[in-house]
Every structure is written in C-alpha cells, then in structure tokens.
Amino acid sequence: TADTPASYFTDVLQPTALTDSAISTRVPILMYHHLAEDVTNDEMVSPEQFEAQIRALTEAGYAGISFDELQAYVLRGEPLPKKPVVITFDDGYLSNYTLAYPILQKYGMKATIFSIGVSFGKDHYKDTDYAMTPHFGAAEAAEMAGSGLISIQSHTYDMHQWPPYEDGSAAVRENILQLPGE
C-alpha cells in the first residue's frame, strides 16, 4: 500500500507501452461516486482526500482527458497528453458539482460524470417520500458542461431504482446469458 496519495499514483498508475497492439499508451481510469466531509463507506471520499489525489496527479504530470478524447485516440490515433488519465463520477451526486467541480477547476482537470436520469435534480427516490443523497440538476450540468472540463453522460435512466434490481429478483436475469440449469 502507498503511504501518500502521490506515492500511490507514482507506483500504481505508470503508463506502460503495450506490445502487439496499435494502442501504445495505457490510460488509467479513476472512478468516484460521492464526496462528503463525513465518509461513511467505500464509495465516498472526503474533499480533502479528493484534492490531495488530484494535486498528486497534477504534480506527477497527469492530464485529465475526456472519454471522447480517449475514443479519438483509440479509433483514429489522435494524440494524447504524455500522461493521460480519465476521471469519472457515477450517479450524478450534487457533491460532484459543489465539492469536486471546484477542485477540478482549480487544477484544470477534466472529468466525466455519468448521471442517473431519473435522479437528475432530485433528493428523493422516485414515487416515494424516501430521502436520497441529492443529485445535481440541469443548471449545474449546464454550467459544468459549459466549462469544457466536464462531460455529462448517461448512467442509465432508471435501472438503479428498478424494483427487481433492488430486490435481486430473477427478472433481472431476463436476456442475460443463462446459467446452467436455467
């Protein structure tokens, strides 16, 4: 294990050339969910931890790229920065806007946020009174996308709140490779 964020990125994320491939640069992809001062699970990171990681990436010479830039490299051989990194956020939490976005702006680091459509701008689960961690809405998405640093993409419309998905029902297995005996 690494002792500091900088040593983690130095030790783990070194791009290495691939052999027998047209792709000559490995691109690390870092995935986050939610930033919070009170970290209560492995899907969360504090703003201080996140900033330390982004600072370490920047100091190590990494440049954030979008998935469009990665795709252009893979499909057309368009050049990438010397040390590219893709930073992603799943689900579209409001903290991506209020906490992560200012840090990404400070360091000029690009990121892609995969927002859940049905949760867009919401703080309650659909059709319920149950509170959920707030998600950013259209105004925040427009501001971030307009910055040129953030790309907003889809992370399903409603799959995260589909009852059979939540309760592990066999209905989830429809149209999926069958298991032996099915």
Predicted regions and their residues:
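Short, well-ordered alpha-helices that flank and scaffold nucleotide-derived cofactor binding pockets
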Residues: P102
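N-terminal pre-catalytic segment of deacetylase/amide-hydrolase enzymes
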Residues: A2-V85
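Metal-dependent polysaccharide deacetylase catalytic core of the NodB/CE4 family, i.e.
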Residues: T25, H33-T40, K83-V85, Q105-E182
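Aromatic- and glycine-enriched glycan-recognition loops and surfaces
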Residues: M44-T58, G92-Y93, T133-E143
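General structural signal for secondary-structure boundaries
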Residues: P5, S46, S66-F67, S95, ...
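Substrate-binding cleft of extracellular glycoside hydrolase catalytic domains
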Residues: E69-L70, K82, V86-L94, L99, ...
